[in-house]
Regions:
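Helix-loop-helix junctions that connect adjacent transmembrane helices in secondary transporters/permeases
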Residues: 151-235
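Short acidic, glycine/serine/threonine-rich loops at helix termini
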Residues: 3-10, 39-45, 66-67, 73-80, ...
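Structured beta-strand/loop patches that form or line metal/cofactor-binding pockets in enzymes
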Residues: 28-51, 209, 213-215
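Glycine-rich loop/linker segments at domain edges
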Residues: 46-131, 213-221
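Short coil/turn connectors at secondary-structure junctions
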Residues: 24-28, 48-49, 56-64, 90-91, ...
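Alpha-helical support elements that line or immediately flank enzyme active sites
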Residues: 2-24, 81-91, 115-150, 162, ...
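Molybdopterin (Moco) oxidoreductase catalytic core of the xanthine/aldehyde oxidoreductase family
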Residues: 34, 42-46, 55-85, 138-176, ...
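Beta-strand segments within the central parallel beta-sheet cores of soluble alpha/beta enzyme folds
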Residues: 2, 25-35, 62-67, 96, ...
Length: 262
């Protein structure tokens, strides 16, 4: 698949192999023991987060300040964009209103961290979900009720902290459908009763939304193209500029074309 480890992490071994090939005049290949591979390659950025949040007795947020510090390791790699994306996802599906979000890229004496599934998004979302849990605990409310109260609206309270209007918002309907189909309220009551009777073994149940941005902050990358030929027998020939590396791109593009010509 098109995962982040393929972006920059191959550069080191490629350079080492190039040096060997240059000096020996022969093809070179590097095969690392798993222990060395795991020690030297980048992982997901650990984050340290501090926040101050203001909310009313219902759990509605009125203001938040958040500092996100990413452990980048010894080199920048892709940490700039990763911390950016963490900042952009520190709202998840919630209207923050008066928000100040600061991102810090921290150089540390560790292996350089790199692109990893979510690319900073999960770290930002985990931070705001902790805020929602903390607000719910403070007020003694069901965390899901606090989350629903702070969801983005459809026509109001629908602009992100980076000034983008949230369109096609179906989070309210999705949550209602999932609450019913998963029997959330019933199961949560049962879990609370179980925990009260069980001094050691505990259970938990939570429902959290996800709003994930799919574009690049380098806006020129947000483009694609395809060439389609329609033949007299009704068949369609499709060419596109993407690279199929296991992520199922050819199938997905074919589905888009089928939808357009439906």
């Amino acid at each position: 698949g098109g995962f982040g480890g393929k972006e920059t992490q191959a550069a080191g071994p490629a350079c080492l192999c190039a040096v060997v090939a240059y000096h020996t005049g022969r093809p070179a290949k590097m095969r690392l023991p798993r222990m060395e591979d795991m020690s030297m390659t980048g992982k997901r950025h650990p984050f340290y987060v501090e926040y101050d949040v203001g909310f009313d007795d219902d759990g509605l947020l009125h203001g938040i300040e958040m500092d996100l510090a990413g452990n980048c390791g010894y080199s920048p790699d892709l940490s700039g964009s990763i911390v950016d994306r963490a900042m952009f996802h520190s709202d998840n599906a919630y209207f923050l209103g008066n928000a100040t979000i600061n991102g810090h890229r921290c150089k540390t004496n560790t292996a350089s961290n790199t692109a990893y599934r979510g690319f900073g998004g999960p770290q930002g979302m985990v931070a705001i979900e902790e805020v929602m849990d903390a607000v719910a605990r403070s007020l003694g409310k069901d965390p899901l009720e606090v989350r629903k109260l702070n969801y983005y609206g459809k026509t109001e309270r629908n602009v992100t902290h980076y000034h983008q209007t949230v369109e096609h918002n179906v989070v309210h309907e999705m949550t209602a459908e999932l609450e019913e189909s998963a029997e959330y309220a019933k199961r949560r009551r049962e879990i609370i009763e179980f925990n009260q009777k069980s001094p050691v073994l505990k259970k938990g149940l939570a429902m959290t939304p996800v709003k994930f941005g799919i574009s690049f902050t380098a806006t020129f990358l947000n483009q694609a193209g395809a060439l389609i030929h329609i033949y007299t027998d009704g068949s369609i020939h499709l060419n596109h500029g993407g690279t199929e590396m296991g992520q199922g791109l050819n199938t997905k593009v074919a589905q888009v074309v089928a939808e357009v010509f439906k």
